[in-house]
């Protein structure tokens, strides 16, 4: 879909590499004895997957393009993110902006904070920021989120994450 010429000027025939695609849905993938990945599909207009990556004794969970049900957090994603060392969560909107964007397939920073607390995650990284928010607004969101969940940071260019 994303490689449709309407959205992307390069066709598959232009690639010099052999490309193999695998459909991933609700799965457990063993990459090696040390690396395991679990995936869960969730609400987004064109579908989306969240990932839990376990490396040795460390875990990070990546939840993007996620629209939680209106009255609660997605139960499957709560299960997926349990006890993550790092939770990287869609924080595209503020709670008030989210009300006007139902069906867009995104979360609020408030939902991300609730998810971090509910899953006993050690650290939260807010990302997939709304491009209409400026740096001052994102800094305000980050500091407000830290008042609720202290170990919160906003993703930004150049951020390096260590597990």
Regions found by a protein language model. Give the residues of each.
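Binuclear metal-dependent hydrolase catalytic cores
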Residues: 1-61, 69-72, 77-78, 136-163
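Conserved acidic
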Residues: 65
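Cap/insert and terminal regions of metallo-dependent hydrolase folds
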Residues: 69-157
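Structural beta-sheet core signal
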Residues: 61-62, 126
């Amino acid at each position: 879909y994303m490689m449709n010429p309407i959205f992307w000027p390069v066709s598959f025939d232009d690639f010099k590499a052999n490309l193999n695609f695998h459909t991933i849905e609700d799965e457990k993938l063993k990459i090696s004895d040390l690396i395991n990945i679990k995936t869960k599909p969730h609400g987004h207009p064109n579908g989306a997957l969240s990932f839990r990556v376990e490396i040795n004794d460390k875990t990070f969970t990546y939840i993007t393009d996620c629209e939680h049900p209106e009255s609660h957090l997605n139960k499957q994603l709560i299960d997926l993110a349990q006890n993550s060392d790092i939770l990287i969560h869609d924080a595209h909107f503020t709670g008030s902006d989210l009300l006007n964007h139902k069906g867009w397939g995104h979360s609020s920073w408030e939902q991300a904070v609730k998810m971090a607390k509910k899953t006993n995650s050690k650290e939260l990284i807010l990302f997939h920021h709304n491009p209409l928010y400026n740096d001052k607004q994102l800094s305000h969101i980050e500091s407000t989120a830290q008042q609720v969940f202290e170990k919160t940071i906003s993703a930004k260019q150049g951020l390096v994450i260590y597990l």
